[in-house]
UniProtKB/Swiss-Prot annotation:
ATP binds at residues 93-103. The active site is at 10, 135. It comes from Vesicomyosocius okutanii subsp. Calyptogena okutanii (strain HA). Its EC number is 2.7.1.148. Catalyzes the phosphorylation of the position 2 hydroxy group of 4-diphosphocytidyl-2C-methyl-D-erythritol. InterPro entries: GHMP_kinase_C_dom, GHMP_kinase_C_sf, GHMP_kinase_N_dom, IspE, Ribosomal_Su5_D2-typ_SF, Ribsml_uS5_D2-typ_fold_subgr. Pfam families: GHMP_kinases_C (PF08544), GHMP_kinases_N (PF00288). The lineage of its organism: Bacteria, Pseudomonadati, Pseudomonadota, Gammaproteobacteria, Candidatus Pseudothioglobaceae. One of its GO terms (biological process) is terpenoid biosynthetic process. This is 4-diphosphocytidyl-2-C-methyl-D-erythritol kinase. Keywords: ATP-binding, Isoprene biosynthesis, Kinase, Nucleotide-binding, Transferase. Pathway: Isoprenoid biosynthesis; isopentenyl diphosphate biosynthesis via DXP pathway; isopentenyl diphosphate from 1-deoxy-D-xylulose 5-phosphate: step 3/6. It catalyses: 4-CDP-2-C-methyl-D-erythritol + ATP = 4-CDP-2-C-methyl-D-erythritol 2-phosphate + ADP + H(+).
Amino acid sequence: MPSTWLAPAKINLFLHINKRRKDNYHNLQTIFQLLDYCDKLTCTITNNGVIKRTSGNKSVKQDQDLIIKAAKALQQYTGTTLGANLSIVKNIPIGGGLGGGSSDAATTLVALNQLWDTKLTQAQLMKLGLNLGADVPVFIFAQSAWAEGIGNILSPIKTPDHYFLVVFINKHISTKEIFSHYALTISEPQGKIANFSELVNTHNDCLQVAIKLEAEIGVALEHLNTCYNRVGQARMSGTGSCVFNEFLTEKDALAAAKKVPKKWMSFVTRAINNSPIYNWAVAKR
């Protein structure tokens, strides 16, 4: 019987790059804010051990799809003889800095761990997920979080029940190109914050490089900064190319959305502190 699971988007409320590591990753500090804007994964368990994608983004080859990689990683790690047919409905823009691929992989791991009854703990799933991508663990953690390390050292954080207008300029920014760019800003690490209200002097160290690579990001930010009733300045999520405004009410966010140029994709979404997969994740801690 098919089982359907949600994979939420995230935004980075800020992103400070602290240090380039010997493994070519970067130490960073950020807040991952989960959103109620989701991809939808449907799993059908099989007895033949075969893992395949039955529908989804055809522009991504099956063997390169993170949901397939995640399923095969869990299968190999646990030794299960079960298989799965996986179908994904993509809503989260690809290559926009919203973590869609990582979230899909995380939901795949959590879902199949439950459906295959492989009994891995959340910590084990997070370790397995880290091999698939630095952002995968936070989606298995299943809570909005203060993050350090390469984004894998996580502490839950409660954020306000605000709304966001997210704009995707329909252009992909290469994370690898951002982090290898000569102009990437490095910030001094801040002390760990105890609550959201302690955020001061935050920014996104990737922003100026992203604008150098794709000037339209700057244009989108300028547009968002003309919106009424926004909370603070418009920001970029992750390494881009999505930018966003924060609002106290859905009404204000929807009013701003009506003025977004039609050439860009946009959506209004709400901040959530717990992921839709939170209950399954905590059951396996």
